[in-house]
Design a protein with these regions (language model features):
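S-adenosyl-L-methionine
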Residues: 1-40
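Conserved class I S-adenosyl-L-methionine
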Residues: 42-51
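Conserved SAM-binding loop
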Residues: 82-83
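Glycine-rich SAM-binding Motif I of class I
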Residues: 53-57
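Core SAM-dependent methyltransferase catalytic element
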Residues: 171-189
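Conserved beta-strand signature within the Rossmann-like core of class I S-adenosyl-L-methionine
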Residues: 137-148
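A short glycine-rich, Lys/Arg-flanked "PGG" loop and its adjoining helix->strand segment in the class I
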Residues: 127-139
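Conserved SAM/SAH-binding beta-strand->alpha-helix loop
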Residues: 75
Length: 189
């Protein structure tokens, strides 16, 4: 049976608020900023925590071929709606903590777009996800993350341990709540 994406969102929010970490899906302005640096012909892109698919739709709208996009979503309620809405995109029901062991399956990526609620996660989990993500990213690849806070939601200790830096791309005041987007990249590049 088809379930509308918003019904899936509010069902998941009521059942597991810390896993969702947002009161509503991201808005179009935030989706455009999150995807603004992604060159549609550059290669494969991984999206973590797509939820209802707001960033997925923005990536496809930029011209990214559906075959170059893989979604990693843990919450069961979002899987069927994502598959129905984006039939040519690969949707994996997977914990983003497992990324480090997915290299053979996923191959190398040019960018990672993440809607994960890092502020609700322990530091070891953030380290595993971001470290695993960078094990998949090509040289020059970037990890895009939004946050409702002022600073990057990947703690500076984790960035330092992994040899990464975070730069703010911008802030979207007209999002509910207002949100900032950070580009995380390797320091040596
Ligand atoms: C804040 S919502 C963002 C949804 C969407 N990207 C947006 O911006 O509207 C967080 C998403 O991350 C997913 N998520 C949380 N922990 C996860 C994990 N360990 N692995 C994969 N997805 C996870 C949740 O199920 C949810 O879809």
């Amino acid at each position: 049976m088809k379930q509308p994406p918003l019904a899936a969102f509010f069902g998941a929010l009521l059942a597991e608020p810390r896993k969702i970490g947002a009161i509503v899906p991201s808005g179009g302005r935030l989706a455009r900023l999150m995807t603004s640096e992604i060159e549609p012909t550059a290669g494969k892109v991984l999206e973590l925590g797509p939820g209802t698919g707001v960033f997925t739709a923005a990536l496809l709208k930029r011209g990214l071929p559906a075959r170059d996009l893989t979604l990693v979503e843990l919450e069961t309620r979002f899987i069927a709606p994502l598959q129905q809405r984006f039939p040519n995109v690969t949707v994996l029901q997977r914990d983003a903590r497992e990324l480090a062991s997915c290299r053979a399956e996923l191959g190398s990526q040019v960018a990672i777009v993440s809607g994960l609620p890092f502020r609700n996660m322990p530091i070891e989990v953030i380290t595993a996800i971001v470290g695993g993500g960078f094990s998949l990213l090509e040289r020059g690849g970037a990890f895009y993350q939004f946050t409702y806070g002022q600073s990057c939601s990947v703690p500076s200790d984790v960035l330092g341990e992994l040899g990464l830096r975070a730069e703010r791309l911008g802030r979207v005041r007209l999002n509910l709540p207002p949100a900032s987007v950070f580009r995380i990249s390797r320091i040596e590049e």
